[in-house]
Amino acid sequence: TFAYQVVVDFARARNRIFTGGMAIDLALKSKGSFLYDKYNIDFDFLSPDFHRDAFDLTDLLGQDLEKDRLNAIVAMHPSTMRVRYNFQAIADITYTPHELFDLIPTIEANGCRIVHPCYQMIDQHLALSMPYANEPLINLGGRYKKDFIRQLKLMRAFPPAKYVKE
């Protein structure tokens, strides 16, 4: 879809780091597997300049989408901006200071810079080991199953022991 390509091109041009479900999907596709079987326009990426990125992405999308249906808002966490169209999330852009942003291990998949799958597994492990961390904001059963499936797929495609530095 249009929004999908705009977000991908925007993040590529600014060398932003995809994380979350889209990063997992891109990593798995590089190994012949997948998480999503269709376009998923719910992107998550990291940025040292998240406010500017959110408003710039909103302006860019507004060139072809109805501007009165687009907005950039503060998401659930104050360090994340959400770009929405018709009240549906298109992108969550999370602040990461330059000093940390440059240290995050990444790989390239389909021309996108994504969090290294083994690093992403840390987030998955955290979600699985602390299922009540965001309670009551989440559906525990659905979220837990989703994270468990993601963790298994990542571990099969990217066995952690293969990527240990000595």
Show the residue positions of the predicted features.
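Short, conserved charged micro-motifs
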Residues: 51-58
